[in-house]
Amino acid sequence: YSNLFQTLYYVADRKYGGRLPIPVHCIMDEWPNVALPDDFDKILATMRSRGISCSIIIQNIAQMKALFKDSYESLIGNCDEFLYLGGNEKEGHKYVSELLGKETLDTNTYGQTKGRSGSYSVNYQQTGRELLTPDEIRLLDNRKAILFIRGERPIMDDKYDLKKHVNFRYTEDG
């Protein structure tokens, strides 16, 4: 990846005044298992201005944390989208639960006493709860995914079944 980004930056800066005329999108599968540029966090933070984007694919947050110890959160922060497909890692469950945030629950409590002067009361209370707890994230249906897009509310949706794609038959698995 080092040579790729050096070349793309060089061409964008020297030949096209800072931005590539045709956007380049890098799909970086098995990202933690390949040699990465030492300054990848800086590259990720500046590539958009040059017409370069990437999809970083990892199995779990722990892989990223092991590689980038102190800067892994800044790497995630430089990504406008985060797609969670499920997993079996406690730290990942907690992370996704925190990203989802909380919801407000309105609770009404009714009370009545019987007797001579009988009284009746209604209490309203608001409490907060995680949208999904880490345990609920762990038990997420395998057909579901959670998508986070910067500036938007999270979306839980069905995963796309690749076997339904018209060109699936042309793949190795088809």
Task: Describe the role of every protein-language-model region.
Residues 1-122, 153-172:
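Conserved P-loop NTPase motor cores
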Residues 104-105, 128, 139:
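Acidic, polar loop-rich interaction surfaces within structured domains
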Residues 122-134:
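Charged, amphipathic alpha-helical segments
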Residues 137, 172-174:
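N-terminal nucleic-acid engagement/recognition segments and initiation subdomains in replication
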Residues 113-116, 130, 140-141:
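Small/polar glycine-rich anion-binding or flexible loop at a beta-alpha turn
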Residues 135-163:
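P-loop NTPase catalytic cores that bind/hydrolyze ATP
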